[in-house]
Amino acid sequence: MDCKFEVELMEKIDSGDNRVTLYFSVPEGFTWEPSAHISLALEGYDENGEFHKDCVRKFSINTLMEENKIGITTRTDSSDSEYKKRIAKMQPGEKCTIIESGCRLPIRRENRGIVFISMGVGMSTVRPLINAIIKDSEKITSVTNICVNKTENYLYKDELGAADHIMCNSRFCHHRTDLRETIDSLNEVDKKIFYVVGSREFVQNMVVLLKEHGVAKEDIMIDKKPGILDGLYEGMSYDEIKKIVKAQKK
C-alpha cells in the first residue's frame, strides 16, 4: 500500500554485531499488523521532483501497535550501501518518510502448531508475531521459534528466553547443520505451519528442506511477493522465477 507518513527518530540502540535498532514516532493515522513491512525513505528521496530509489529501503516493523513506536533493526556493515551508512548515523530528532507499507505474514489460526525459522536480523520480523500470539493464542496449539545466528548474540535473546515458559519454545542454532537437526527433531512436521524469514538463499534452502520433510507448499509462509513461493517449492532459482513473473505481466 502506497502512503506518505513522516516519522521522527526517537531512540537508537546498538544491538551488537554491526546491528542497530531504531525506534520512530507513530504518525497519526498509521496502523500496521504484526510482521508488517515499510519502505523507509531518507531525506532527499524525492529531490528535484525525481524519485531516488537509493534513498529507500524496506524493513520489517519489530514492534506491535500497542508499544506506541515503530521499531526496525538492520545490519550496518554493508560497505557498498550508502543508505546503511546514512541510517546508521541518524540521531534522535531527525526525520524520514514511510512511503509504503504492507503485510505478507498474517497469523494463521487453524488449531495447529506454528514454527518460525529466521536467520540473523530476520528475527526482527518474527518478534511481533510471537508477542501477538503470546497475547492471544486462540486456535494456535504450539509455537516453536528457531533462530540461526553465527554468534551467541541473538536478537531479543533475553526476551525470548522469558517467553519460553509461557508457550514459545525457542531454539538457537549456530549453523545450518544445527538447523537441519532441529527440524528433524520436530514432532509432526508435516502438520505444522512454517514461517521462514531471512536472506534469499536462506529462504530458498529452507523451502527445499521443508518440502523434503513433507511440508505442503500451502503450509509455508515467506515474506516475498506472490509467485515466489510457487517457484521455490518447484526448485527454481530466483532468476528463473523472475523471468516467469515478468512474462506473466506482459
For each predicted feature, which ranges?
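FNR/FR-type flavoprotein reductase catalytic core
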Residues: C3, T73, S79-K250
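Ferredoxin-reductase
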Residues: D2-E94, N149-T151
